[in-house]
Amino acid sequence: MRRQGWDGPAILVTLFLCTASSPVAAAEPPPETIAKGKALTEAGDCGSCHTADPAKPFAGGKRIATPFGGIYSANLTPDRNTGLGLWSDEDFRRAMRFGVRPDGANYYPAFPYPHFTKLTRDDILAIRAYLATLSPVANTQPAPELRWPLNYRVLMRLWNFAFFRPGIFEPDQNKSAEWNRGGYLVEGLAHCGACHTPKNFLGADKQSARFAGSVVDGWFAPRLDGAMRGGLKSWSVEDIAEYLGSGRNGHSHADGPMAQVVLNSTSHMSDADVHAIAVYLKEIQPSAPEAAATAPSPTQMADGEKLYKGACIACHELDGSGAPRIYPPLPGNTNLQSENPASAIRIVLDGAETITTPRAPNTGSMPPYASKMSDQEVADVVTYVRNAWGNAAPAVTAAEVAKARK
């Protein structure tokens, strides 16, 4: 649940390119606060973007690609020279709530402060307390590689004026406590919209198309609203919770950046929080209509069917039913029926391996076909699975596949 616009790979960037400020308070937080902060840090998927070297977790240095150039994630360890070791609690709160560095400069919105602004002060400081327990690692990040004039941070003040609305999440008194907890996570800490909401030409969320899906690192982060084919209309609350907790359900499997989100974040969440997210997502109504799917040509469907029967039926079966929670079913698959075919193309080209989580330890894999199929053949077989068995989605072209190979 990665980003387009300012938001880079993985569902999820906390960018602290900072200078030192006032010293950290010496008081040791209680163990329960640190444990809470660890859980919140996992829910925010901070490690995915702030870990370039697995041997140096949270030390930053990972390059985040944006349409405007590269940005490097910062060091969240308590190193005093290159990390957060000299930050005060107030420095950390201002960064999370307002996107402002200790020296007063603005962060770029690749760091999802437009979402983190919704967190309570207690939760922000619990995250801070947990990060302070990490082993300090000296690791200086390269400067951002943004093109002129975006390399001037002062311009972010204009961006904030136009698009940023700070403020803690306000519960809806007409909704249940569970729905409000889900909203707090979806809209705030988990920052789902950072990947699943399309962006405008300046990298800000298109509010007229909230959760309508967006391209992230060559994959399509699908709709999270109630759209019939490409959204969650056919998923129950339990389906959504199972997917977030395990990376799979009876409808689909997590692949690409979303697989990392499940591995590093949602699979670590409590059952209660996963269920709360599912309750909230299930009530999101489509903000933008699904595009009508024109039936592909009979020739392309016939060619795609031949390829499918030759390469796919051993695992996915002739009727596309697959194997429960090992090889995903293809009929009714929302990822397949997304208006944008990027994810389906990527899986055929690169193959896939089902992630394993404590809730779903068994695995399955699919070989890559990039070297075995031409661009047209990939387009044909993807078009076929997107339109067979009652599915409906736009046809895929060889040009789209060629672009995905680059």
Model-based region annotation:
Residues P9-A20:
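Bacterial N-terminal signal peptides
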Residues Q337-A342, A352-A360:
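C-terminal lobe and pocket-closing loops
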Residues P23-A27:
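Boundary at the C-terminal end of the N-terminal hydrophobic targeting segment
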Residues P31-E32, A43, T51-G70, P102-G183, ...:
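Flexible coil segments in periplasmic/lumen-exposed cytochrome c-class electron-transfer proteins
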Residues E305-S343:
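C-terminal structural cap/anchor segments
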Residues L84-V100, G104, A126, K233-V237:
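Aromatic- and charge-enriched surface segment that lines or borders ligand/interaction sites
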Residues M1-D7:
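N-terminal secretory signal peptides that target proteins for export/translocation
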